[in-house]
Regions:
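Pepsin/retropepsin-fold aspartyl endopeptidases
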Residues: 1-155
Length: 155
């Protein structure tokens, strides 16, 4: 099974990205998420900006006392696991929909709640981290010179 990826520019370099659908049934909200597949990130996250743009109150889907301190983009953030029920679906190269849910899906909020902290957290992309790759036994193929990338799980 292969999940096709796109190769896009991020911070001056080519990176692999995957698009998936994330649904929050309680809110009747569906998000089309473009996530950076980041082998340098331990955690899978959904961008604060994407949640806010769809009208999801972030404080209502997290426990404010349960967070992990994390460095991303040179700044410290608080990573909150999403407690609200959600579903994630990907499209395979054969146009089949598959459900691959992370063990935890985080949203990153600023460590220092000031204007700069919020701006930095708002600018972070959604990320598919190593936790997701391990949990679903996925391998990443990435050839930036040919603009080719995919996630693959041997069946």
């Amino acid at each position: 099974m292969k999940i096709p990826l796109k190769v896009e520019k991020l911070h001056g370099g080519l990176k692999p990205f995957v698009t998936f659908i994330c649904e929050f049934p309680r809110y009747h909200k569906r998000l089309f998420v473009n996530a950076f597949v980041d082998t340098g990130s331990n955690h899978t996250s959904i961008a604060l900006s994407q949640l806010l743009k769809r009208g999801i109150n972030v404080k209502s889907i997290i426990d404010e006392n349960d967070f992990t301190e994390i460095m991303i983009g040179g700044a410290k953030h608080k990573g909150y696991p999403i407690k609200e029920r959600f579903d994630i679906r990907f499209l395979t190269q054969n146009n089949k929909t598959i459900h691959l849910k992370p063990e935890k899906l985080y949203v990153y909020l600023p460590y220092h709640e000031n204007k700069e902290g919020w701006a930095m957290s708002y600018s972070l992309p959604s990320i598919i981290g190593v936790d997701f790759l391990i949990h679903h036994n996925l391998s990443l193929y990435f050839n930036p010179s040919k603009q080719m990338a995919w996630l693959e799980r041997e069946e």
